[in-house]
Amino acid sequence: MVTIETRADQMVLNLGPHHPSTHGVLRLIVTLDGENVVDCRPVLGYLHRGMEKIGENRTIIQYLPYCSRWDYAAAMMNEAPVVNAPEAMAGVKVPRRASYIRVIMLELSRIANHLLWVGPFLLDMGAQSPFFYILRERELILDLFEAATGLRMVGNNYFRVGGVTVDLPYGWVDKAHDLCDVIPGKIDEYERLITNNPIFRRRIENLGYISREDAINWGLSGPMLRASGVKWDLRKVDHYEIYDELDWDIAWDTGGDCLARYIVRIKEMRESVKIIRQALDQLPGGPYEQLEARRLAEGPKSEWNSFDYQFIGKKSSPTFKIPTGEYYARSEEAKGELGIYVVGRDDTTPWRWKIRTPDFANLAILPMILQGTKVADLVVVLGSIDIIMGSVDR
């Protein structure tokens, strides 16, 4: 009698570090049993540039251009905690107009990030059309960034200790209002095309499940945490900038799978549009052209020249010293909690500069949620986390 022997050896597969589906220079050492993933070990560091050590050898002004090289999909969001930490340590006050401008820029960056997530996420599953649609809308946001800061994607260098670099230019507020009229309709278009598509839903429902307890225990943040049923948003928790003065809701879901993470990001884009609309309407002094007209009409002693109507309180000098002490500043970035831990020594440079990026923490759970999935689903689960390797490796 002839017997057929089958080999049951496990196979080790190297994915990356330059595979397009890894969204950067990420290497995954995947152990497979047939088509099932048994183990996955991320290998990091291919894009490590020593951002923390650079921060310890630069003044705040010198270091700000480096920040946009962390998460370059939402570059301006990296600047917020970098200036918030010295402001809190030195007791620097920020004018209300500057705070409103910051919030507008942060929420525009959030929408730009989520648009750039939706397109490649669908592309990982073989759907090419949405990728071209999101570039169309993202272009409108990048045009606004270019008008206000001079640059589109990275190196905006717009936030400053005490405010922002320059005021919003002539006609910018009207263009931002036009954008807020366009984006909701485009999100509706995405939802008609994607959300209830039966092929899309069968592909990602119940895939990459993370329970509420696991999300908390692994220290997840952002859409990864809120998609597992945890209503935690630093904009509500920490009450920073002027978010408390605006009416908006936390985007969350209880599914815990890849579909829930997609739904949360779609909801977040809608909430960001609500925030931007209100911030534009309530902007102290109104559009730049109206504010300047009031100042000219009422003279140098006009109330429109008071502190709250400035784009920066007091320009920090190149020799601005970080006071002795330590502080942890954090903000709700598009991917989660971005934190900066600073130890000052009454010097122009910090003694310790620690960066806590959200996608580095969120990536840690990948090996756990991949166990038992098919190898074909690996890139989909990875894509649902939303990582940028410049931010992960720093």
From Swiss-Prot:
<dbReference type="Pfam" id="PF00346">
    <property type="entry name" value="Complex1_49kDa"/>
</dbReference>
<keyword id="KW-0520">NAD</keyword>
<dbReference type="InterPro" id="IPR001135">
    <property type="entry name" value="NADH_Q_OxRdtase_suD"/>
</dbReference>
<keyword id="KW-0472">Membrane</keyword>
<comment type="function">
    <text>NDH-1 shuttles electrons from an unknown electron donor, via FMN and iron-sulfur (Fe-S) centers, to quinones in the respiratory and/or the photosynthetic chain. The immediate electron acceptor for the enzyme in this species is believed to be plastoquinone. Couples the redox reaction to proton translocation, and thus conserves the redox energy in a proton gradient. Cyanobacterial NDH-1 also plays a role in inorganic carbon-concentration.</text>
</comment>
<keyword id="KW-1003">Cell membrane</keyword>
<keyword id="KW-0997">Cell inner membrane</keyword>
<keyword id="KW-0521">NADP</keyword>
<keyword id="KW-0813">Transport</keyword>
<protein>
    <recommendedName>
        <fullName>NAD(P)H-quinone oxidoreductase subunit H 2</fullName>
        <ecNumber>7.1.1.-</ecNumber>
    </recommendedName>
</protein>
<dbReference type="InterPro" id="IPR029014">
    <property type="entry name" value="NiFe-Hase_large"/>
</dbReference>
<comment type="similarity">
    <text>Belongs to the complex I 49 kDa subunit family.</text>
</comment>
<keyword id="KW-1278">Translocase</keyword>
<dbReference type="GO" id="GO:0019684">
    <property type="term" value="P:photosynthesis, light reaction"/>
</dbReference>
<dbReference type="GO" id="GO:0051287">
    <property type="term" value="F:NAD binding"/>
</dbReference>
<dbReference type="GO" id="GO:0016655">
    <property type="term" value="F:oxidoreductase activity, acting on NAD(P)H, quinone or similar compound as acceptor"/>
</dbReference>
<dbReference type="GO" id="GO:0048038">
    <property type="term" value="F:quinone binding"/>
</dbReference>
<comment type="subunit">
    <text>NDH-1 can be composed of about 15 different subunits; different subcomplexes with different compositions have been identified which probably have different functions.</text>
</comment>
<dbReference type="InterPro" id="IPR022885">
    <property type="entry name" value="NDH1_su_D/H"/>
</dbReference>
<dbReference type="GO" id="GO:0005886">
    <property type="term" value="C:plasma membrane"/>
</dbReference>
<dbReference type="InterPro" id="IPR014029">
    <property type="entry name" value="NADH_UbQ_OxRdtase_49kDa_CS"/>
</dbReference>
<keyword id="KW-0874">Quinone</keyword>
<keyword id="KW-0618">Plastoquinone</keyword>
